[in-house]
Amino acid sequence: MSANQDITLTEGEGSRPAGDKGKGKAVGSEDIPMEQYSGDSETEESDAADDETFPEDDIEEEEEAGDDNLERISEENIIPGGRRTRGKVINFAEAAEKVEADDAMDDDDDEEYKQRDEDDEMQG
């Protein structure tokens, strides 16, 4: 828009007070008193929600149906020799002692720690 053009305001534009930013109530809206609302609308909504089916319900039903069709596992699929540890023999008693020793070392570190005060940081 150039400075030479005239700007026309329609009725109502520009007639607002300077402090009014248009955030008031909408024109023509009416407040409805609470007495006019009936309590039945809430129960109708909750009844309607109970009648709806949700996809999660269908999934659970399919999983339950799938559990009934379990077949026996073939022993040919079981790996012999306990290769879950890739052949390494684990001494669980020794591993437990090692874990306890590591925990004891951590406790020593906690006892030596002294928290610095904020006042010490500002003075030093």
Curated annotation (Swiss-Prot):
User: Which UniProt keyword terms apply here?
Assistant: Chaperone, Nucleus
For this UniProt entry, what is the primary localization, expressed as one broad class? nucleus
| Comp. bias intervals (Acidic residues) | 41-68, 102-124
Record-linked SMART domains:
CHZ
Sorted alphabetically, the Gene Ontology cellular component annotations on this record are:
nucleus
Source organism's superkingdom?
Eukaryota
Location of region: Disordered: 1-124
Q: Where in the cell is it found?
A: Nucleus
InterPro entries the record matches: Histone_chaperone_domain_CHZ
Q: List the disulfide bonds.
A: none
Q: What does this protein do?
A: Forms a chaperone-bound H2A.Z-H2B complex that acts as a source for SWR1 complex-dependent H2A to H2A.Z histone replacement in chromatin.
The record's note on quaternary structure and interaction partners says:
Forms a heterotrimer with H2A.Z-H2B, stabilizing the association of the histone dimer. Also, with a lower affinity, forms a heterotrimer with H2A-H2B.
State the family named in the UniProt similarity comment for this chain: Belongs to the CHZ1 family.
In Swiss-Prot or TrEMBL terms, this protein is called Histone H2A.Z-specific chaperone CHZ1
Q: Which organism is it from?
A: Coccidioides immitis (strain RS)
Q: What is the lineage of its organism?
A: Eukaryota, Fungi, Dikarya, Ascomycota, Pezizomycotina
- Gene that produces this protein: CHZ1
